[in-house]
Protein backbone atom coordinates (compact mmCIF):
# COMPACT_ATOMS: atom_id res chain seq x y z
CA UNK A 1 0.00 0.00 0.00
CA UNK A 2 1.49 3.31 -1.06
CA UNK A 3 0.28 6.90 -1.38
CA UNK A 4 2.53 8.65 -3.89
CA UNK A 5 1.04 12.16 -3.96
CA UNK A 6 -1.51 13.93 -1.76
CA UNK A 7 -3.21 16.91 -3.44
CA UNK A 8 -5.11 18.23 -0.41
CA UNK A 9 -7.47 21.18 -0.83
CA UNK A 10 -9.35 21.58 2.46
CA UNK A 11 -12.33 19.22 2.15
CA UNK A 12 -11.89 18.12 -1.46
CA UNK A 13 -8.98 15.71 -1.68
CA UNK A 14 -7.09 13.99 -4.47
CA UNK A 15 -4.44 11.33 -3.89
CA UNK A 16 -2.24 9.34 -6.26
CA UNK A 17 -1.68 5.72 -5.23
CA UNK A 18 0.17 2.64 -6.50
CA UNK A 19 -0.60 -1.08 -6.60
CA UNK A 20 2.23 -3.52 -7.31
CA UNK A 21 1.80 -5.48 -10.56
CA UNK A 22 2.36 -8.87 -8.91
CA UNK A 23 -0.62 -8.28 -6.60
CA UNK A 24 -2.83 -7.51 -9.58
CA UNK A 25 -1.70 -10.54 -11.60
CA UNK A 26 -1.99 -12.91 -8.62
CA UNK A 27 -5.52 -11.69 -7.95
CA UNK A 28 -6.55 -12.05 -11.60
CA UNK A 29 -5.11 -15.59 -11.72
CA UNK A 30 -7.01 -16.51 -8.57
CA UNK A 31 -10.26 -15.13 -10.01
CA UNK A 32 -9.72 -17.03 -13.28
CA UNK A 33 -9.24 -20.31 -11.40
CA UNK A 34 -12.42 -19.72 -9.41
CA UNK A 35 -14.35 -18.84 -12.57
CA UNK A 36 -13.02 -21.86 -14.47
CA UNK A 37 -14.68 -24.18 -11.94
CA UNK A 38 -18.18 -22.90 -12.73
CA UNK A 39 -18.16 -21.39 -16.23
CA UNK A 40 -19.91 -23.11 -19.15
CA UNK A 41 -18.15 -22.83 -22.54
CA UNK A 42 -19.40 -24.47 -25.75
CA UNK A 43 -17.65 -27.79 -26.40
CA UNK A 44 -16.75 -28.41 -22.75
CA UNK A 45 -18.58 -29.67 -19.70
CA UNK A 46 -19.27 -27.19 -16.90
CA UNK A 47 -15.99 -26.32 -15.15
CA UNK A 48 -13.85 -28.41 -17.53
CA UNK A 49 -12.70 -25.78 -20.04
CA UNK A 50 -8.89 -25.27 -20.15
CA UNK A 51 -7.69 -22.27 -18.17
CA UNK A 52 -6.12 -20.58 -21.23
CA UNK A 53 -9.51 -20.61 -23.01
CA UNK A 54 -11.24 -19.17 -19.93
CA UNK A 55 -8.53 -16.51 -19.70
CA UNK A 56 -8.86 -15.59 -23.37
CA UNK A 57 -12.60 -15.04 -23.01
CA UNK A 58 -12.84 -13.46 -19.55
CA UNK A 59 -9.44 -11.87 -18.79
CA UNK A 60 -10.35 -8.32 -19.78
CA UNK A 61 -13.61 -8.38 -17.83
CA UNK A 62 -11.93 -9.84 -14.73
CA UNK A 63 -9.07 -7.37 -15.02
CA UNK A 64 -11.41 -4.37 -14.80
CA UNK A 65 -13.26 -5.92 -11.87
CA UNK A 66 -10.03 -6.77 -10.02
CA UNK A 67 -8.54 -3.33 -10.57
CA UNK A 68 -11.59 -1.62 -9.09
CA UNK A 69 -11.69 -3.99 -6.10
CA UNK A 70 -7.98 -3.56 -5.37
CA UNK A 71 -8.13 0.23 -5.73
CA UNK A 72 -11.13 0.44 -3.44
CA UNK A 73 -9.68 -1.92 -0.82
CA UNK A 74 -6.34 -0.12 -0.81
CA UNK A 75 -7.93 3.33 -0.60
CA UNK A 76 -10.30 2.40 2.25
CA UNK A 77 -7.44 0.76 4.18
CA UNK A 78 -5.32 3.90 3.77
CA UNK A 79 -8.14 6.17 4.96
CA UNK A 80 -8.78 4.00 8.02
CA UNK A 81 -5.08 3.99 8.86
CA UNK A 82 -4.90 7.80 8.57
CA UNK A 83 -8.26 8.18 10.40
CA UNK A 84 -9.73 10.24 7.56
CA UNK A 85 -13.53 10.36 7.42
CA UNK A 86 -14.51 10.09 3.75
CA UNK A 87 -18.09 11.26 3.10
CA UNK A 88 -18.33 11.00 -0.70
CA UNK A 89 -18.11 8.09 -3.09
CA UNK A 90 -14.45 7.85 -4.19
CA UNK A 91 -13.81 8.51 -7.88
CA UNK A 92 -11.02 6.27 -9.22
CA UNK A 93 -9.18 7.09 -12.45
CA UNK A 94 -6.10 5.73 -14.24
CA UNK A 95 -4.72 6.10 -17.75
CA UNK A 96 -4.05 2.46 -18.59
CA UNK A 97 -2.90 -0.83 -17.09
CA UNK A 98 -0.11 -2.90 -18.61
CA UNK A 99 0.82 -6.35 -17.44
CA UNK A 100 3.94 -6.54 -15.26
CA UNK A 101 3.79 -2.79 -14.56
CA UNK A 102 2.57 -1.23 -11.34
CA UNK A 103 -0.82 0.51 -11.51
CA UNK A 104 -0.71 4.24 -10.80
CA UNK A 105 -4.18 5.68 -10.13
CA UNK A 106 -5.86 8.77 -8.72
CA UNK A 107 -8.69 9.04 -6.21
CA UNK A 108 -10.88 12.11 -5.73
CA UNK A 109 -13.09 12.35 -2.65
CA UNK A 110 -14.48 14.68 0.00
CA UNK A 111 -13.91 14.48 3.74
CA UNK A 112 -15.94 15.52 6.75
CA UNK A 113 -14.88 18.90 8.18
CA UNK A 114 -13.07 19.01 11.50
CA UNK A 115 -14.48 21.64 13.86
CA UNK A 116 -12.03 23.33 16.22
CA UNK A 117 -14.52 25.03 18.51
CA UNK A 118 -13.71 28.68 19.28
CA UNK A 119 -15.43 31.35 21.32
CA UNK A 120 -17.16 29.16 23.90
CA UNK A 121 -15.68 31.25 26.74
CA UNK A 122 -16.75 34.61 25.32
CA UNK A 123 -20.47 34.12 24.71
CA UNK A 124 -22.86 36.91 25.74
CA UNK A 125 -26.62 36.44 25.50
CA UNK A 126 -29.70 38.40 26.42
CA UNK A 127 -32.22 36.44 28.51
CA UNK A 128 -35.72 37.95 28.38
CA UNK A 129 -37.65 38.04 31.67
CA UNK A 130 -41.31 38.00 30.66
CA UNK A 131 -44.16 38.30 33.14
CA UNK A 132 -47.58 37.25 31.87
CA UNK A 133 -50.19 39.89 32.71
CA UNK A 134 -53.98 39.78 32.71
CA UNK A 135 -53.93 42.10 29.69
CA UNK A 136 -51.95 39.45 27.80
CA UNK A 137 -54.66 36.92 28.57
CA UNK A 138 -57.30 39.45 27.48
CA UNK A 139 -55.54 39.93 24.15
CA UNK A 140 -55.17 36.17 23.61
CA UNK A 141 -58.85 35.64 24.48
CA UNK A 142 -59.90 38.30 21.97
CA UNK A 143 -57.73 36.65 19.32
CA UNK A 144 -59.21 33.24 20.17
CA UNK A 145 -62.75 34.55 19.73
CA UNK A 146 -61.85 36.11 16.37
CA UNK A 147 -60.26 32.87 15.17
CA UNK A 148 -63.45 30.94 15.89
CA UNK A 149 -65.84 33.26 14.06
CA UNK A 150 -67.78 32.29 10.94
CA UNK A 151 -68.94 33.94 7.72
CA UNK A 152 -72.69 34.48 7.32
CA UNK A 153 -74.60 35.75 4.30
CA UNK A 154 -76.17 39.18 4.58
CA UNK A 155 -78.57 41.28 2.50
CA UNK A 156 -76.92 44.46 3.75
CA UNK A 157 -74.75 46.62 1.53
CA UNK A 158 -71.09 45.57 1.35
CA UNK A 159 -68.67 47.44 3.59
CA UNK A 160 -65.03 47.21 4.68
CA UNK A 161 -64.23 43.83 6.37
CA UNK A 162 -67.11 42.09 4.55
CA UNK A 163 -66.31 39.15 2.27
CA UNK A 164 -67.69 39.35 -1.25
CA UNK A 165 -67.98 36.90 -4.14
CA UNK A 166 -68.10 38.39 -7.64
CA UNK A 167 -67.96 37.69 -11.35
CA UNK A 168 -66.30 40.39 -13.45
CA UNK A 169 -64.67 41.29 -16.72
CA UNK A 170 -63.00 44.46 -17.95
CA UNK A 171 -63.12 46.40 -21.20
CA UNK A 172 -61.12 49.25 -22.71
CA UNK A 173 -62.80 51.19 -25.52
CA UNK A 174 -65.44 48.41 -25.81
CA UNK A 175 -62.77 45.71 -26.22
CA UNK A 176 -62.34 42.90 -23.69
CA UNK A 177 -59.31 43.42 -21.44
CA UNK A 178 -57.16 40.30 -21.67
CA UNK A 179 -56.83 38.46 -18.37
CA UNK A 180 -59.51 40.54 -16.64
CA UNK A 181 -62.28 37.94 -16.52
CA UNK A 182 -62.93 36.10 -13.24
CA UNK A 183 -65.65 33.81 -11.93
CA UNK A 184 -66.53 33.38 -8.24
CA UNK A 185 -63.68 35.62 -7.14
CA UNK A 186 -63.94 36.10 -3.38
CA UNK A 187 -62.00 38.40 -1.07
CA UNK A 188 -62.39 40.45 2.09
CA UNK A 189 -62.77 44.16 1.40
CA UNK A 190 -59.89 46.24 2.72
CA UNK A 191 -57.79 43.31 4.00
CA UNK A 192 -54.41 43.39 2.20
CA UNK A 193 -55.72 42.50 -1.26
CA UNK A 194 -52.60 43.03 -3.33
CA UNK A 195 -54.01 40.94 -6.18
CA UNK A 196 -57.06 43.22 -6.55
CA UNK A 197 -56.80 46.23 -8.89
CA UNK A 198 -56.87 49.47 -6.83
CA UNK A 199 -60.32 51.07 -6.99
CA UNK A 200 -62.26 47.82 -7.42
CA UNK A 201 -62.97 47.39 -3.71
CA UNK A 202 -64.20 50.96 -3.27
CA UNK A 203 -66.52 50.47 -6.24
CA UNK A 204 -68.11 47.42 -4.60
CA UNK A 205 -68.75 49.10 -1.23
CA UNK A 206 -72.41 50.11 -0.90
CA UNK A 207 -73.75 47.45 -3.29
CA UNK A 208 -75.81 44.42 -2.26
CA UNK A 209 -75.82 40.77 -3.33
CA UNK A 210 -77.57 40.46 -6.70
CA UNK A 211 -76.47 43.88 -7.93
CA UNK A 212 -74.91 44.26 -11.38
CA UNK A 213 -72.89 47.40 -11.99
CA UNK A 214 -69.88 48.96 -13.69
CA UNK A 215 -66.74 50.39 -12.06
CA UNK A 216 -64.54 52.84 -13.95
CA UNK A 217 -60.85 52.47 -13.07
CA UNK A 218 -57.73 54.07 -14.49
CA UNK A 219 -55.24 51.22 -14.69
CA UNK A 220 -52.35 51.70 -12.21
CA UNK A 221 -48.69 52.33 -12.99
CA UNK A 222 -47.83 48.75 -12.00
CA UNK A 223 -50.23 47.25 -14.57
CA UNK A 224 -49.05 44.97 -17.38
CA UNK A 225 -48.77 45.29 -20.29
CA UNK A 226 -47.06 48.66 -20.08
CA UNK A 227 -49.05 50.32 -22.87
CA UNK A 228 -52.30 49.99 -20.89
CA UNK A 229 -51.07 51.86 -17.83
CA UNK A 230 -53.15 54.95 -17.07
CA UNK A 231 -55.94 53.99 -19.49
CA UNK A 232 -59.60 53.98 -18.43
CA UNK A 233 -61.01 50.48 -17.99
CA UNK A 234 -64.66 49.62 -17.33
CA UNK A 235 -65.18 46.59 -15.09
CA UNK A 236 -68.60 44.93 -15.26
CA UNK A 237 -69.32 43.34 -11.88
CA UNK A 238 -71.96 40.85 -10.74
CA UNK A 239 -72.02 40.85 -6.93
CA UNK A 240 -73.12 37.30 -6.12
CA UNK A 241 -72.68 37.18 -2.35
CA UNK A 242 -71.92 39.43 0.63
CA UNK A 243 -70.87 37.88 3.96
CA UNK A 244 -70.22 39.34 7.39
CA UNK A 245 -67.90 37.83 9.97
CA UNK A 246 -69.83 36.83 13.09
CA UNK A 247 -68.01 36.33 16.39
CA UNK A 248 -69.11 33.55 18.75
CA UNK A 249 -70.64 34.37 22.13
CA UNK A 250 -68.38 33.72 25.10
CA UNK A 251 -70.78 31.25 26.68
CA UNK A 252 -70.51 27.80 28.25
CA UNK A 253 -70.98 25.86 24.99
CA UNK A 254 -68.27 27.84 23.18
CA UNK A 255 -65.84 27.52 26.09
CA UNK A 256 -66.37 23.73 26.24
CA UNK A 257 -65.76 23.62 22.49
CA UNK A 258 -62.30 25.04 23.24
CA UNK A 259 -61.52 22.09 25.52
CA UNK A 260 -62.36 23.64 28.90
CA UNK A 261 -64.42 20.99 30.68
CA UNK A 262 -66.10 23.20 33.30
CA UNK A 263 -67.20 25.71 30.65
CA UNK A 264 -66.32 28.75 32.78
CA UNK A 265 -64.55 31.94 31.74
CA UNK A 266 -62.15 31.46 34.65
CA UNK A 267 -61.30 27.97 33.43
CA UNK A 268 -60.71 29.32 29.92
CA UNK A 269 -58.44 32.08 31.20
CA UNK A 270 -56.43 29.51 33.20
CA UNK A 271 -56.04 27.41 30.05
CA UNK A 272 -54.92 30.46 28.07
CA UNK A 273 -52.35 31.29 30.76
CA UNK A 274 -50.93 27.77 30.57
CA UNK A 275 -50.87 27.95 26.76
CA UNK A 276 -48.91 31.21 26.96
CA UNK A 277 -46.50 29.75 29.53
CA UNK A 278 -45.70 26.76 27.30
CA UNK A 279 -45.42 29.00 24.23
CA UNK A 280 -43.21 31.46 26.09
CA UNK A 281 -40.93 28.74 27.47
CA UNK A 282 -40.20 27.49 23.96
CA UNK A 283 -39.86 31.00 22.55
CA UNK A 284 -37.32 32.09 25.19
CA UNK A 285 -35.38 28.86 24.78
CA UNK A 286 -35.16 29.30 21.00
CA UNK A 287 -34.33 33.01 21.36
CA UNK A 288 -31.33 32.23 23.56
CA UNK A 289 -30.26 29.30 21.39
CA UNK A 290 -30.34 31.52 18.29
CA UNK A 291 -28.03 34.05 19.95
CA UNK A 292 -25.54 31.36 20.95
CA UNK A 293 -25.55 29.73 17.52
CA UNK A 294 -25.22 33.03 15.66
CA UNK A 295 -22.23 34.02 17.80
CA UNK A 296 -20.48 30.68 17.36
CA UNK A 297 -21.04 30.78 13.60
CA UNK A 298 -19.51 34.27 13.50
CA UNK A 299 -16.28 33.15 15.22
CA UNK A 300 -15.98 29.66 13.73
CA UNK A 301 -15.24 29.44 10.01
CA UNK A 302 -16.60 26.01 9.11
CA UNK A 303 -16.07 24.73 5.58
CA UNK A 304 -18.84 22.45 4.34
CA UNK A 305 -18.28 19.80 1.63
CA UNK A 306 -20.27 20.23 -1.58
CA UNK A 307 -21.81 16.79 -1.24
CA UNK A 308 -23.26 17.61 2.19
CA UNK A 309 -24.72 20.86 0.85
CA UNK A 310 -26.32 19.06 -2.10
CA UNK A 311 -27.87 16.44 0.18
CA UNK A 312 -29.25 19.12 2.50
CA UNK A 313 -30.65 21.08 -0.45
CA UNK A 314 -32.63 18.02 -1.52
CA UNK A 315 -34.00 17.61 2.02
CA UNK A 316 -35.07 21.28 2.10
CA UNK A 317 -36.77 21.00 -1.29
CA UNK A 318 -38.64 17.86 -0.24
CA UNK A 319 -39.87 19.53 2.94
CA UNK A 320 -40.91 22.63 1.01
CA UNK A 321 -42.87 20.49 -1.45
CA UNK A 322 -44.72 18.68 1.34
CA UNK A 323 -45.40 21.93 3.21
CA UNK A 324 -46.59 23.97 0.26
CA UNK A 325 -48.51 21.19 -1.47
CA UNK A 326 -49.57 21.22 -5.08
CA UNK A 327 -48.79 24.65 -6.48
CA UNK A 328 -47.13 25.93 -9.58
CA UNK A 329 -43.48 24.96 -9.83
CA UNK A 330 -42.46 28.58 -10.33
CA UNK A 331 -43.96 29.50 -6.96
CA UNK A 332 -42.14 26.64 -5.25
CA UNK A 333 -38.66 27.27 -6.64
CA UNK A 334 -36.46 29.55 -4.57
CA UNK A 335 -33.23 30.97 -5.87
CA UNK A 336 -30.31 28.57 -5.77
CA UNK A 337 -28.33 31.02 -3.63
CA UNK A 338 -30.99 31.22 -0.91
CA UNK A 339 -31.46 27.46 -0.63
CA UNK A 340 -27.71 26.84 -0.68
CA UNK A 341 -27.12 29.41 2.07
CA UNK A 342 -29.88 27.85 4.16
CA UNK A 343 -28.47 24.35 3.62
CA UNK A 344 -24.92 25.43 4.49
CA UNK A 345 -26.06 27.17 7.68
CA UNK A 346 -28.04 24.11 8.82
CA UNK A 347 -25.03 21.84 8.32
CA UNK A 348 -22.70 24.26 10.12
CA UNK A 349 -25.10 24.38 13.08
CA UNK A 350 -25.25 20.58 13.19
CA UNK A 351 -21.45 20.30 13.10
CA UNK A 352 -21.13 22.88 15.90
CA UNK A 353 -23.65 21.07 18.10
CA UNK A 354 -22.00 17.70 17.48
CA UNK A 355 -18.65 19.12 18.58
CA UNK A 356 -20.16 20.75 21.69
CA UNK A 357 -21.86 17.48 22.65
CA UNK A 358 -18.60 15.57 22.11
CA UNK A 359 -16.44 18.01 24.08
CA UNK A 360 -18.85 18.07 27.04
CA UNK A 361 -19.57 14.32 26.85
CA UNK A 362 -23.32 14.99 26.87
CA UNK A 363 -25.71 12.05 27.11
CA UNK A 364 -29.40 12.45 26.37
CA UNK A 365 -31.66 12.93 29.40
CA UNK A 366 -34.57 10.51 28.91
CA UNK A 367 -36.77 12.29 31.45
CA UNK A 368 -36.45 15.48 29.43
CA UNK A 369 -37.35 13.58 26.28
CA UNK A 370 -40.69 12.69 27.83
CA UNK A 371 -41.21 16.28 29.00
CA UNK A 372 -40.49 17.66 25.51
CA UNK A 373 -42.92 15.17 23.98
CA UNK A 374 -45.63 16.27 26.43
CA UNK A 375 -44.98 19.94 25.54
CA UNK A 376 -45.26 19.15 21.84
CA UNK A 377 -48.46 17.20 22.44
CA UNK A 378 -49.95 19.96 24.59
CA UNK A 379 -49.44 22.60 21.88
CA UNK A 380 -50.72 20.40 19.05
CA UNK A 381 -54.33 19.63 18.09
CA UNK A 382 -53.12 16.08 17.33
CA UNK A 383 -52.11 15.48 20.94
CA UNK A 384 -52.89 11.76 21.08
CA UNK A 385 -51.21 11.11 17.72
CA UNK A 386 -47.95 12.61 19.00
CA UNK A 387 -48.07 10.52 22.18
CA UNK A 388 -48.80 7.35 20.17
CA UNK A 389 -45.97 8.16 17.75
CA UNK A 390 -43.55 8.69 20.63
CA UNK A 391 -44.49 5.34 22.16
CA UNK A 392 -44.44 3.35 18.92
CA UNK A 393 -42.03 5.02 16.49
CA UNK A 394 -38.27 5.03 16.97
CA UNK A 395 -37.99 7.89 14.43
CA UNK A 396 -40.11 10.11 16.67
CA UNK A 397 -37.94 9.29 19.68
CA UNK A 398 -34.78 10.03 17.67
CA UNK A 399 -36.20 13.39 16.66
CA UNK A 400 -36.99 14.31 20.27
CA UNK A 401 -33.63 12.92 21.40
CA UNK A 402 -31.88 15.34 19.04
CA UNK A 403 -33.94 18.25 20.39
CA UNK A 404 -32.98 17.38 23.96
CA UNK A 405 -29.29 16.98 23.08
CA UNK A 406 -29.35 20.43 21.45
CA UNK A 407 -30.90 21.93 24.58
CA UNK A 408 -28.35 20.25 26.83
CA UNK A 409 -25.52 21.45 24.57
CA UNK A 410 -26.72 25.07 24.73
CA UNK A 411 -27.18 24.83 28.51
CA UNK A 412 -23.61 23.54 28.87
CA UNK A 413 -22.34 26.64 27.07
CA UNK A 414 -24.56 28.98 29.09
CA UNK A 415 -22.83 27.79 32.28
CA UNK A 416 -19.81 29.89 31.19
CA UNK A 417 -21.67 32.57 29.22
CA UNK A 418 -22.31 36.17 30.19
CA UNK A 419 -26.11 36.15 30.56
CA UNK A 420 -27.77 39.57 30.66
CA UNK A 421 -31.33 39.47 32.00
CA UNK A 422 -33.77 41.98 30.54
CA UNK A 423 -37.41 42.58 31.51
CA UNK A 424 -39.80 42.82 28.58
CA UNK A 425 -43.57 42.66 28.09
CA UNK A 426 -45.00 39.50 26.52
CA UNK A 427 -46.50 41.35 23.55
CA UNK A 428 -43.25 43.24 22.90
CA UNK A 429 -41.21 40.04 23.09
CA UNK A 430 -43.46 38.16 20.65
CA UNK A 431 -43.42 41.16 18.31
CA UNK A 432 -39.62 41.22 18.50
CA UNK A 433 -39.49 37.55 17.53
CA UNK A 434 -41.81 38.05 14.56
CA UNK A 435 -39.57 40.80 13.17
CA UNK A 436 -36.25 39.06 13.77
Curated annotation (Swiss-Prot):
InterPro entries: PPIase_dom_sf, PPIase_FKBP_dom, Trig_fac, Trigger_fac_C, Trigger_fac_C_sf, Trigger_fac_ribosome-bd_bac, Trigger_fac_ribosome-bd_sf, Trigger_fact/SurA_dom_sf. Its main location: cytoplasm. One of its GO terms (cellular component) is cytoplasm. The keyword Zinc does not apply. It catalyses: [protein]-peptidylproline (omega=180) = [protein]-peptidylproline (omega=0). It is found in: Cytoplasm. Residues 161-248 form the PPIase FKBP-type domain. Keywords: Cell cycle, Cell division, Chaperone, Cytoplasm, Isomerase, Rotamase. GO terms for biological process: 'de novo' cotranslational protein folding; cell division; chaperone-mediated protein folding; protein transport; protein unfolding. It holds the Pfam family Trigger_N. Its EC number is 5.2.1.8. One of its GO terms (molecular function) is protein folding chaperone. Consists of 3 domains; the N-terminus binds the ribosome, the middle domain has PPIase activity, while the C-terminus has intrinsic chaperone activity on its own. Belongs to the FKBP-type PPIase family. Tig subfamily. Involved in protein export. Acts as a chaperone by maintaining the newly synthesized protein in an open conformation. Functions as a peptidyl-prolyl cis-trans isomerase. NCBIfam families: tig. This is Trigger factor. It comes from Baumannia cicadellinicola subsp. Homalodisca coagulata. The gene is tig.
